[in-house]
Amino acid sequence: MLRGQRLGQLGWHRPAAGLGSLMTSLMLACASAASCREVCCPVGPSGLRCTRAGSLDTLRGLRGAGNLTELYVENQQHLQRLEFEDLQGLGELRSLTIVKSGLRFVAPDAFRFTPRLSHLNLSSNALESLSWKTVQGLSLQDLTLSGNPLHCSCALFWLQRWEQEGLCGVHTQTLHDSGPGDQFLPLGHNTSCGVPTVKIQMPNDSVEVGDDVFLQCQVEGLALQQADWILTELEGAATVKKFGDLPSLGLILVNVTSDLNKKNVTCWAENDVGRAEVSVQVSVSFPASVHLGLAVEQHHWCIPFSVDGQPAPSLRWLFNGSVLNETSFIFTQFLESALTNETMRHGCLRLNQPTHVNNGNYTLLAANPYGQAAASVMAAFMDNPFEFNPEDPIPVSFSPVDGNSTSRDPVEKKDETPFGVSVAVGLAVSAALFLSALLLVLNKCGQRSKFGINRPAVLAPEDGLAMSLHFMTLGGSSLSPTEGKGSGLQGHIMENPQYFSDTCVHHIKRQDIILKWELGEGAFGKVFLAECYNLLNDQDKMLVAVKALKEASENARQDFQREAELLTMLQHQHIVRFFGVCTEGGPLLMVFEYMRHGDLNRFLRSHGPDAKLLAGGEDVAPGPLGLGQLLAVASQVAAGMVYLASLHFVHRDLATRNCLVGQGLVVKIGDFGMSRDIYSTDYYRVGGRTMLPIRWMPPESILYRKFSTESDVWSFGVVLWEIFTYGKQPWYQLSNTEAIECITQGRELERPRACPPDVYAIMRGCWQREPQQRLSMKDVHARLQALAQAPPSYLDVLG
């Protein structure tokens, strides 16, 4: 209330609408005055200043001024108490100043309705004490209490701590004791002050579902005021019964459930000094449970699962009924949960680049001392690309993909000559060979091999097989110009034990292999078409390509073993499949998938616009491949390269001659090591025996022998050019020396006439001079897939 005058007499006329327009009324009351002479005058848009001496004994007259943010009160000797009702409705108040007044008491809940208060100045009043509860919950930046006759007691111990810790500017003030001599308030003077000590006792160490749990809260301390339990997390987890009072409070949890696990049971107590609380968690044991979800493709494939149980269950995976041994490629990963108050754990069985061999039934077993559970799910990551009978006639009948193409689909003759088959198929499997180069050279571990051979640390350059494989490395590498003379491949390829530590090469009995005829010959030996029995469970026999090692030296056997280990690991629908080896007797044999239509370069030429000219009178395909079919071919090669890049393999000899074509226009990366003999003009001999495919190499590989996944991207751009020229040789009009000059000077191959601009843009993205600026194989594959699914309308207006 205002002393001596009512609100109306001071110009505080409340509008009929209520208290919400108090500030508006205050501002209007003084708007026309040169200087305000009322008890309280507005300051700025949302402030109020009350300085007329002795005019206020309470602040309740301000209730309802909802937009008030700053209140300044001075020289009000009759204002002695501040209760929580006084500031009701002032929810926006941020600064409160009451100075040089008669304030003696501030209620512990005085600021309940002003949660945004950040500046509090109560200096030069008659305060002897101030409860810690008064400022609890406020985000104070400044608290000023100087000039008050504070009485040193435990009730101000919190203020002493604030002064010691430098909080809210308290340490910058001079606080006085109300005792004689006007002494300073000493820091830590009363060492007997302290917050209550709270302990919770729980005699039940082992609790199961349905049990009753007894807890007791013991409280110690001076001037105890209140104590109680906080049980907000226990709703539905148990029936609660409370009993007792200070200093000992009891709690019974009746018929507990598993939901009680990891829920906090809290006991708190207060005194003049402050508040203390302690929490415990009751562990309720219950059997394991498990749930499995369907496999989801993420960065790695994920088979999601959820497991529950207390104690936390142990986990074990089965694959098709057998124990699944986890590796760096197949592993369990738990997901971090934002919820910390539950026992259920969520996670994934991660599979890095799974293939059809990983298709099957996955079972998760969970067990703890109170029970076990299991759940199973079928997962199919990739279709099996080998489900066909290789002895059946294989017509090249393509479904037209390009809706705008008018060309007829090519059809293959059933009666192919053995030599035609040999060349077509022969080049099919050595993807394996070039893939291994990296391994041949590098094993310095000297361990006993699975073939009974001691591995040397370095391969000699004379080894024919080493030379046939030296175009495949792990990661990036660089070769010296003298490679192929005396240095061999020493030091250029390091073995990654991650890939080969547990490689299991399949051994095939020699009696199950029946050679039919020779397909071709490379530096390593000969390649044969053969029948193989008992190779697959669902077939008695099947056609395969067999590579025979002609040299039986220790080094050659070493290379043979290393290559077999590498090829066993590579499993992808667009990498030629390796079935295993035969080491009984001699010669050593490798067994590969049979690709009937041979290498991609020859296939493109025989299905291109110049097919009749190249055939020399023989029957040819009825028409060139359409745009949709060319895009499908390119997309498949890109898919294989994405797989190799994911394993950090560098191909180093990617070209259409080293890709193979099978039934239904299925294209795979692979050759039998014969391409350097059949396509000798594609290679440039350096030094003694080193042959480099310079027309497919980027500048850094030509100049510095630096090979990386980025150099493979460049080579793929050239492969794309080959596909859309129907197998032409890059820079066919130039010699090797002239081609090197064009590449190193930054010239690019011209856009083929059958190539849409979108595809040529991909080629150019692969041919950026700086390796880091080239497209990634993933990006290339994604773009080609999108184009293959919806081929662009393209008309060769120049043709």
From Swiss-Prot:
CDD domains: IgI_TrKABC_d5
UniProt keyword DNA-binding present: no
Residues under site feature: Interaction with SHC1: Y499
GO cellular component terms given for this protein: axon; cell surface; cytoplasm; dendrite; early endosome; early endosome membrane; late endosome; late endosome membrane
Post-translational modification: Ligand-mediated autophosphorylation. Interaction with SQSTM1 is phosphotyrosine-dependent. Autophosphorylation at Tyr-499 mediates interaction and phosphorylation of SHC1. N-glycosylated.
Catalytic activity, EC: 2.7.10.1
Residues annotated as site: Interaction with PLCG1: Y794
Residues covered by the Ig-like C2-type domain: 196-285, 205-368
Binding annotation for ATP: L519, G520, E521, G522, A523, F524, G525, K526, V527, K547
Record's bilayer topology term: Single-pass type I membrane protein
Stored InterPro entries: Ig-like_dom, Ig-like_dom_sf, Ig-like_fold, Kinase-like_dom_sf, Leu-rich_rpt, LRR_dom_sf, NTRK, NTRK1
Protein location: Cell membrane; Early endosome membrane; Late endosome membrane; Recycling endosome membrane
Record text on activity regulation: The pro-survival signaling effect of NTRK1 in neurons requires its endocytosis into signaling early endosomes and its retrograde axonal transport. This is regulated by different proteins including CFL1, RAC1 and SORT1. NTF3 is unable to induce this signaling probably due to the lability of the NTF3-NTRK1 complex in endosomes. SH2D1A inhibits the autophosphorylation of the receptor, and alters the recruitment and activation of downstream effectors and signaling cascades. Regulated by NGFR.
Enzyme class: transferase
Residue intervals of the Protein kinase domain: 513-784
Extracellular domain ranges by topology: 34-420
Family indicated by similarity: Belongs to the protein kinase superfamily. Tyr protein kinase family. Insulin receptor subfamily.
Record remark: domains: The transmembrane domain mediates interaction with KIDINS220. The extracellular domain mediates interaction with NGFR.
Quaternary structure annotation from Swiss-Prot or TrEMBL: Exists in a dynamic equilibrium between monomeric (low affinity) and dimeric (high affinity) structures. Homodimerization is induced by binding of a NGF dimer. Found in a complex, at least composed of KIDINS220, MAGI2, NTRK1 and RAPGEF2; the complex is mainly formed at late endosomes in a nerve growth factor (NGF)-dependent manner. Interacts with RAPGEF2; the interaction is strengthened after NGF stimulation. Interacts with SQSTM1; bridges NTRK1 to NGFR.
Listed name of the protein: High affinity nerve growth factor receptor
Organism expressing this protein natively: Mus musculus
Gene: Ntrk1
